[in-house]
């Protein structure tokens, strides 16, 4: 592991009770600062499971995960949460914006959870929303935004804590082709301009091909494309 390594997993395995076959079987991956990594695979191949393990949202059956040089297994749940919130951002296929809050408030929530003042959190959220092209939608509720705008707000929420790496699970899965390309353009621009590493799980081979490194998850293992 180099000083620039943000995420690393070694011989990662995951099995579930009642299943004879490992969902993940001996996966090793290193994510360095500023990298772009795409992971493709069929539905049920374990792509989301791998992303959850990398993000410390689930525990492996065997193997290890390190974030910023720290083994997740050696940390308490509270310590894992603190490290996760400091180093990682998450974007999902479903935006998970809270319908009762404005776009601005939704993006500010991670900062408020970290006990920043409301004014400071809203100020930072406004800056990030402007970066993703939603400066004119600050006071709109999620239901008043288009699908692409909601996903841009979700990207802004992932970025508001200044993460070193964004883990994106099918971030364009519910979008039409044109809107999906726009969201992907946004992620790549943020990677280029801010040096945020990207690990993107997607079923879209055309979008995956735009990333620096591409892997296919098949039979529990990662294969370089």
Swiss-Prot record:
It comes from the Bacteria. The keyword Cell wall biogenesis/degradation does not apply. ATP binds at residues 41-48. The complex is composed of two ATP-binding proteins (LolD) and two transmembrane proteins (LolC and LolE). The gene is lolD. Transmembrane segments: none annotated. GO terms for biological process: lipoprotein localization to outer membrane; protein localization to outer membrane. This is Lipoprotein-releasing system ATP-binding protein LolD.
